[in-house]
């Protein structure tokens, strides 16, 4: 008996998500994949000016700081947060919850950039 799976896992940022990351100021060279001209996904960094950079979830997480002002990066199935263990409780400095981990990661990166915690080596110079 053959089992058929209907996986619909997202393997990289969509074109729209990629445009959002570029608008936040991420260097296209930080992408580990790209949407090539003509709707084809490539597992190579962008080479042509018409290629649209794409980021794997692993790469997005890799660019996030592991810790900041005492808070540690915590990643769960449906959320990303920076939390700090205090004497009697956990203190969340930032948390985003949602079904799409790519959207969660992009929202987290957006917050990190806004707060000045995102590594500037990944950002275009202004």
What are these model-derived regions, one by one?
Residues 1-126:
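Glycine-rich anion-binding surface patch
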């Amino acid at each position: 008996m053959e089992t058929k799976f209907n996986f619909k896992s997202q393997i990289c940022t969509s074109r729209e998500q990629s445009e959002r990351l570029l608008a936040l100021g991420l260097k296209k060279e930080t992408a580990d994949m790209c949407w090539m001209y003509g709707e084809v996904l490539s597992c190579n960094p962008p080479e042509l000016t018409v290629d649209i950079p794409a980021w794997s979830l692993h790469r997005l997480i890799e660019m996030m700081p592991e810790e900041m002002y005492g808070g540690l990066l915590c990643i769960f199935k449906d959320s990303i947060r920076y939390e700090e263990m205090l004497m009697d409780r956990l203190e969340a400095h930032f948390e985003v919850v949602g079904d799409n981990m790519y959207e969660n990661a992009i929202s987290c990166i957006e917050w990190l950039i806004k707060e000045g915690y995102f590594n500037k080596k990944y950002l275009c110079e202004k």
